[in-house]
Every structure is written in C-alpha cells, then in structure tokens.
C-alpha cells in the first residue's frame, strides 16, 4: 500500500509540474505575442542597428531603378562613346582574350603548405591604401569573398580575403565600404593576374558593392572544367591538392559579426591562402595535357589557353538587378505553380487564395526593400501558402499560423538558432497582412502605395536609409509603367513615334523582363558538376525528393540518384559553363530576347532525344542582332526550299472530303521556283482585308489580282464572303483575332463560325517572313525555354513549344476546310526527308548548317564556352525524366 501511495504522489507531482511548465510556456508565448502585436506602430529597425545602415553611399539600392555601372572618363576617346551602362574595361579584357598573358609562375621559389598564424586585418583607410600599394607591386594575388544575403535585400560583401606569396589580408568591407574604390586600380590592372575559384558571382558582387571590375583573372574552377576533374569545388581541391580539410558549413555563418570567431578567420584565410598553390598545380597539369595532345598544334586547342580564355570571359559579366513586371510577380507565379499546378490538386487553392498569394508576394517584396531584408527573412513561401489557404481572421491567428508552419517546415534552419519565426518585419507590420486577408485593400495597385506611405511617408513608421530612400521616387514610376498598357489602350498606336522612341517601346515590350540564366548548379551524387540551370528546375528536384540543397547563394543541389551520363563524357562542355545575360552577338546587357538558331518549324519535328532539354541552339540576342539573324534565317529557308524542292508555303488547301484517301494535303508538283509556291499568310490576310473593305470600289484588274491570291489558297475554287472572312484570320493567334474583330471597318457576318476557328486552328508563325517584326517576337515570346539546357536527363525543366503551336500540320479532323499555315508543313517534310534518306546524322548535319548561317550573319563575340557548330545534340533519358520513352508508355 505504501508503494502505491508513493507512486500516486509521484504521478501527481509530475503531472502538476508538467501542467505548470505548459502553463508558463503558453503564458510567456501569449505575452510575447501581445507585446509584439501591440507595437505595430513601431518598426523594429528603431531598436536594431544593422551593420549596413552605417554605409553612407550604396551603388545598388533597393529601388526599381537600373544599376549604373562605372563610367570611365577618357579624354582621348570622348568622341567614341561606349554603350551606356556597358563594361568599362571591355577593351582591356578583349585584348586579354585575344592575347592571354600566361607566361608567368603563380609561385616564387619553394612554397610551404603550412599556414602560419600571422595575417593582417585591414579595417582603416590608411591600411587599405597600404594594401593597394603592396598589391600594385605583385604579379599575381589570390582573392575570395564572403557574402551576407539573409539580412539584406540584394546582399552585400562582408569580407574580402586577399593572399600574396608572403601574407594573408582580411579586408573588413563593412568598415571600409565607402572607400573600397581604393582597390579598384589593382583589380582592373591587366598586368596583374587575380586568382579566384568559381568567380562567376564574386565578379558581379564586387561590381555591385564597390564598382570594382576584375581584369586578367585565372579561375581555378575553369581550369578544373578544362581538365575534366571529377569535382570542381574548392573543398575538393584543398583536400586533393593541399591535403587540407575545411568545413563548408561556415560559409553560411553570419559574416557581419565582429569580431569574427577564430574558426571563421581560419576558414576565410584558408580559401585564399592556398589558391596560388592550387593554381600553380593546375597550370602544370594543363601544360602536360597540351604536350600530350600532339594532334592539335593550333593554339586554340592549347588547354592552358582555353582555361585562361574561360576565366577572362567571366570578367565580362555585368551585374544587373533582377526586374519584374510587378513587385513579387515572379515569386507568386512560382508559388502558385509549385503548390497548385505543379501537384495537380487544384482544390487546395481557390481563386481568392491565388489572389492573396499575389498580394502577399508583392507586399513581401516591398517590405524586403524598405527594411533591407531578404524576402525569406520577411515571410517564407510556405507561410504564404498557409495564410492563403487558411485565411485566418485575427492577428493572433495569423501570428500562430506563420509560427506553426515555419516550425513544421524548418525552411530556414540557419535562422532557428537566432531569431524565431515570425520574424521582426511580420511582428511590426502584422496589421498589413490582416487587412489583405480581409480584402480591405482590394487591388495591388492600391495596396502597395498605401503600405509605402505608411512606412516611409511624412509620419512613416520605418526609418529612411540609403537603401530605401529611392523607393519614394521610383515606386510611382514602377506602378505607372505596369498600368500603362491598360490606360493607353489603342491611343498608343495612333501616336507618331520617332524611330528611336518606337524602338525603345518595342524593346520594352518584347525584351526579357527578368534574367534568363540564374546559373544555379546541379551536382551528381559523386560531386561532379552536371549543369547550370534556373531556379525552377532546382525546385522541381527538391519538391520530388530527388535532390538535396548543398549551397544557398548561389543555389546548388546534389542529386540523390545516379544520373544518366555526364556532360564532359558526352563532349557537352557547353552545359557546364555559366551563361551571361547579354546578347551573344554584341554584348548588349540592357535588353535581350531569346532566339532559336534552328527554326521551330524544323526543330519541333526532330526526334525527342535530339531536342528535349537541349538549349545549345537557344541564345540571347538584342533587338538589332535578332533582326539580322532572323533575316539571314529567312533567306536560308528559301535556299532550303529550293534545294529540297519543298515549298515554304502550302500551294493549295483541299476540302477535307477531297483530301480523304490522299497521302498528302499539299500538291507535289512545284513551280519553277519553289520559294514562290504557296501563299504567305501575310499576303493572304492583306488580300482578304482589301477585298472585304474596298472590293466594290477598287478597279476590276486589281480586284481580280487579289482574288487570285486568295483563290490560290483555297485551291482555285470560287470564293464566298465567308471564305474571305476566314482568310482574314489565317495565321493570327486567338488574341490577335479578337483584337482584329474589334477594329472599326471590319464586320463579320459569319462571326459565330469564324470565332469557332479560334479553337480549330493553332499554327506556328515563327517561320513567316513577316514585314512587321513585332509578329515574329510575339511568336518568340510564346515559347518558354529551358535556360539550363543541362546535361542531365531528369526533370521537366521548362516547357518546349507544344506541337499545336509549332506544327502547322496539326489539324482538327472536324474542320470543313483543312488549313496548313506558316512553314510548319515545309519543316515537317524536310525533317521526314532527312530522317528517311540520311537518318539522325542527316538531322545533325542540318543543324550544323543552321549554326553556320547564324555565325556568318551575326559574328557572335560572346557565345558561352563550349558552344560550337559541330555540337551533336544527342542525349539519353534517365529514370525520372518525363521524356523517358518507357515512362511515357506507362502513363499513356
């Protein structure tokens, strides 16, 4: 009995203790929440001093304005003005590309691999000037940087490590931010070689923060690519070449903190200290390879020269701010795709929830800019989805929803040790989310100006800084440019633009609205680099549990399965090169458009393994180079048509009844010149428009001429007014058709039947020789391109143009008239002929011909490393690929 009584007492006491702990925890949590939610009128930045708020001037603020690059004042060449916002040292780098300086050693005498405890911490302006003087006397020095991106919207450089033969220097770029230009001359000196590892981001970060431009660089990562090393990471080189192990998790530490821990100092020194020794070892290997390769005496095949060329190509990169049509639009589209369309269950998110996702993403973007915080520190993607689905109705519920979701997903493990979710921005501005959920701010255009005024207005709750001040000026411009098309309507087309203004309007309308290449990395499970790709592809792997995140800035993943093949094994070095968001022709970086070197009318009919996830033949061009390339392609199409005897346009279209039992809807007999066979959709529409509008008033000879043009399309039979109405819509997209119907002077008596054509015909206009270049670009923009073009076979990447868009031969059997438009039928017959007569080798030769046409027309000077005319394009499909034939069969 005594034992039972004691047990009861113990259980009772334990229960009371547990209840007390739970009560105290809940009390503290509620007290903290009340404290945080009750101080909504006060921003957390009034009590928290962020290191970057000590900067007196920033080159890249958080506004929507374009980043302005350094402009060099050269009196001798003032008349020859360089392109606005171009690379200030492009001339010097081009000289190095043509005449690389590699005849020197990275080491002087014997080198000890032991790293001493001695180093120099540079934190004053006088020390920085002394360092600049020391570096100016060096022939080579090593560089590395440490970044901070979590508590900053654009990120900033927190530390620069520089190593010479004698000493290691750690430069406190937070303390010296405003005077870092002191180092600009030594970094831009073409006579001094700067050694980096994986400098693609370091180069643009130095431009962003300090207007420091690297000229003459040797990148040990590029040397690894040329040598086809199994891994290209610095940790791998440190271990295999120097026998030094490093903890790469330290890269994610908060490099803003001062003083740095001993472990962080040693890590920072290690990255730069051994780079000179590693560079020397790799150049020795490159020279040995060049000696062994006796079959290629030409210097272009010299491995050391190739490594130098790739390194200096990296120097030409230019920093650009990511731009969007509207704040947060890219993030909201990605979230909706991943959590709705990407998983097929459309019941999870209603239309109202989708709109709330857009509002929250726009609000998150603006709050990140105002407070200089990364968007993930403001509000996580998972929290946005949770709020949009649950739509809590009180501030307490909103707070709990965010806290529980972030705790469950642990989306930011690096934050959990310091600050718990919800993060300070949410706690200070919880009322904004409450109003958005209640739909008190119904429109995005209303929401953002109100939030901006509340935060930065005359009586704003948030402090003004060098990072957010420009938002007050540029934000109205951003919103007005977003709304301009709706307000102006058709009036814009009535205005008389000068050539320059018209071109600027065209560029604004059709150029890419955000960087195409994100240069995210995918590694195989053995650590070898497979490819560079965009963020969406990384998310595809991560969401399916096929990969793990190994680096955050820039993002990199490692596959958890064995991929099918390696790029270097297949001779596809192109896919393991970083790509710059510039025109490959002239280097224009302010605007660019995607361009298909091999026209879609051919490529869409290629076998799957010769086109899927292949971006070798998709490049970026500015408007001027795009026009040159397109004109050359149109001329060459005519040569192809003559050579193969297959006309570009359908000679005539048969009734579906007549077509039954025939093997082809296109007449085989050709005229003397096959390029004149058939009717161009543009000429067809022009003739139909003239006949409908002025047919009764025009001279009989002209009327007959136009009738013959339309009759040729319909096979020579008599025409009805209904035929003319249908011809007027040939080759137009559904949007263009509706737009045409609204124009004055055009009425359709058979509008119901004509409108039905929108769903019956979907053709590719990509191949048409349109006089209006805008038509061409409309088709170009309808293509969603995989910007990675990776060498892996897994993942869905980005969508190719579907067959109904590209294939003019895709017809609906219900049509009373079968319509073959554009160059689709021509392309299909060409590819069928090549496969029938020459097999896949014929298709590859055909592709090489088109690449040569492109090179001869544009003379590209900025093509990515590894791009070549003789690229094979072949690939295999792995187990998880949506293009795997066995997988396709199993799903059908």
Swiss-Prot record:
Keyword terms: Cytoplasm
GO BP annotation list: exonucleolytic trimming to generate mature 3'-end of 5.8S rRNA from tricistronic rRNA transcript (SSU-rRNA, 5.8S rRNA, LSU-rRNA)
Residue span, 3'-5' exonuclease domain: 119-287
Localization of this protein: Cytoplasm, Cytosol
Region of interest (Disordered), ranges: 785-811
HRDC domain segment(s): 350-436
TM helices/strands, residue ranges: none
Record-linked InterPro entries: 3'-5'_exonuclease_dom, HRDC-like_sf, HRDC_dom, HRDC_dom_sf, RNaseH-like_sf, RNaseH_sf, Rrp6-like, Rrp6p-like_exo
GO cellular component, as recorded: cytoplasm; cytosol
Superkingdom classification of source: Eukaryota
Keyword Cytoplasm set for record: yes
A single GO molecular function term of this UniProt record: 3'-5'-RNA exonuclease activity
The protein's name: Protein RRP6-like 3
Organism of origin: Arabidopsis thaliana
């Amino acid at each position: 009995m005594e034992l039972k009584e004691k047990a009861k007492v113990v259980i009772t006491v334990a229960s009371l203790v547990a209840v007390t702990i739970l009560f105290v925890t809940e009390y503290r949590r509620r007290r903290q929440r009340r404290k945080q939610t009750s101080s909504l009128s006060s921003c957390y930045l009034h009590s928290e001093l962020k290191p970057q708020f000590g900067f007196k001037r920033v080159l890249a603020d958080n506004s929507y304005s374009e980043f302005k690059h350094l402009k060099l004042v050269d009196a001798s060449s003032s008349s020859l003005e360089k392109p606005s916002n171009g690379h200030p040292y492009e001339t010097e780098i081009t000289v190095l590309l043509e005449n690389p300086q590699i005849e020197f050693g990275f080491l002087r005498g014997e080198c000890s691999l032991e790293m001493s405890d001695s180093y120099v911490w540079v934190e004053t302006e006088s020390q920085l000037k002394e360092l600049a003087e020391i570096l100016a006397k060096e022939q080579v020095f090593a560089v590395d940087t440490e970044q901070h991106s979590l508590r900053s919207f654009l990120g900033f450089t927190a530390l620069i490590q520089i190593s010479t033969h004698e000493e290691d220097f750690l430069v406190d770029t937070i303390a010296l931010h405003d005077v870092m230009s002191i180092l600009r001359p030594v970094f831009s000196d073409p006579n001094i070689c700067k050694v980096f590892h994986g400098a693609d981001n370091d180069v643009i970060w130095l431009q962003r923060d300090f207007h420091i431009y690297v000229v003459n660089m040797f990148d040990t990562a590029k040397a690894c690519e040329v040598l086809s090393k199994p891994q290209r990471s610095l940790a791998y080189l440190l271990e295999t070449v120097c026998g030094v192990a490093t903890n790469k998790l330290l890269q994610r530490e908060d490099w803003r903190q001062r003083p740095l821990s001993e472990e962080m100092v040693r890590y920072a020194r290690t990255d730069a200290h051994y780079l000179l020794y590693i560079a020397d070892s790799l150049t020795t290997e490159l020279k040995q390879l060049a000696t062994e390769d006796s079959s290629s005496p030409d210097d272009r095949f010299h491995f050391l020269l190739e490594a130098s060329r790739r390194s200096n190509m990296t120097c030409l990169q230019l920093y650009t701010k990511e731009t969007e049509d509207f704040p947060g639009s890219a993030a909201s589209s990605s979230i909706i795709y991943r959590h709705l369309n990407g998983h097929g269950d459309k019941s999870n998110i209603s239309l109202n929830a989708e709109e709330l996702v857009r509002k929250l993403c726009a609000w998150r973007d603006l709050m990140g800019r105002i407070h200089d915080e990364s968007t993930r520190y403001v509000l996580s993607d998972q929290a946005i989805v949770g709020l949009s689905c649950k739509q809590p109705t009180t501030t307490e519920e909103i707070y709990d929803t965010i806290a529980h979701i972030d705790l469950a997903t642990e989306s930011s493990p690096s934050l959990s040790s310091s600050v718990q979710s919800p993060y300070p921005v949410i706690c200070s501005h919880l009322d904004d989310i409450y109003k958005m959920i209640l739909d008190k701010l119904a429109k995005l255009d209303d929401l953002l100006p109100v939030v901006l005024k509340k935060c930065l207005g005359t009586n704003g709750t948030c402090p003004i800084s060098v990072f957010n001040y420009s938002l007050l000026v540029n934000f109205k411009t951003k919103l007005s440019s977003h709304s301009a098309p709706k307000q102006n309507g058709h009036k814009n087309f009535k205005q008389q633009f000068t050539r320059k203004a018209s071109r600027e309007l065209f560029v604004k309308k059709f150029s890419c609205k955000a960087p195409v290449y994100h240069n995210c990395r995918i590694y195989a499970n053995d650590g070898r680099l497979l490819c560079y790709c965009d963020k969406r592809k990384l998310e595809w792997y991560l969401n399916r549990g096929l990969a793990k995140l190994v680096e955050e800035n820039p993002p990199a993943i490692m596959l958890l399965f064995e991929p099918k093949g390696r790029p270097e094994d297949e001779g596809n070095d192109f896919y393991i090169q970083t790509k710059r968001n510039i025109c490959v022709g002239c280097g224009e970086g302010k605007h660019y458009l995607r361009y298909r070197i091999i026209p879609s009318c051919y490529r869409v009919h290629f076998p799957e393994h010769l086109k899927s996830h292949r971006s070798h033949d998709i490049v970026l061009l500015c408007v001027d180079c795009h026009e040159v390339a397109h004109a050359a392609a149109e001329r060459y199409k005519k040569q192809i048509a003559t050579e193969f005897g297959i006309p570009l346009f359908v000679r005539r279209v048969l009734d579906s009844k007549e077509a039954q039992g025939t093997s082809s809807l296109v007449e085989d007999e050709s005229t003397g010149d096959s390029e004149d066979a058939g009717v161009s959709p543009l000429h067809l529409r022009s003739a139909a428009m003239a006949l409908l509008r002025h047919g009764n008033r025009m001279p009989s000879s002209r009327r007959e001429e136009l009738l013959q043009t339309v009759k040729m399309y319909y096979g020579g039979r008599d025409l009805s007014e209904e035929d003319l109405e249908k011809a007027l819509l040939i080759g137009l997209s559904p949007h263009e058709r509706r737009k045409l119907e609204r124009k004055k002077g055009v009425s359709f008596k058979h509008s119901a039947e004509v409108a039905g054509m929108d769903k019956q015909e979907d053709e590719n206009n990509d191949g048409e020789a349109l006089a209006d270049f805008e038509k061409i670009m409309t088709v170009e923009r309808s293509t969603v391109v995989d910007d990675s073009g990776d060498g892996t076979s897994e993942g869905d990447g980005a969508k190719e143009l579907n067959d109904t868009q590209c294939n003019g031969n895709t017809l609906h059997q219900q049509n009373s008239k079968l319509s073959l438009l554009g160059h689709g039928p021509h392309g299909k017959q060409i590819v069928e002929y090549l496969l029938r007569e020459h097999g896949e080798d014929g298709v590859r030769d055909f592709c090489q011909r088109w690449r040569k046409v492109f090179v001869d027309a544009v003379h590209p000077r900025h093509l990515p490393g590894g791009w070549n005319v003789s690229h094979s394009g072949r690939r295999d499909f792995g187990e998880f690929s949506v293009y795997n034939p066995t997988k396709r069969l199993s799903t059908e």
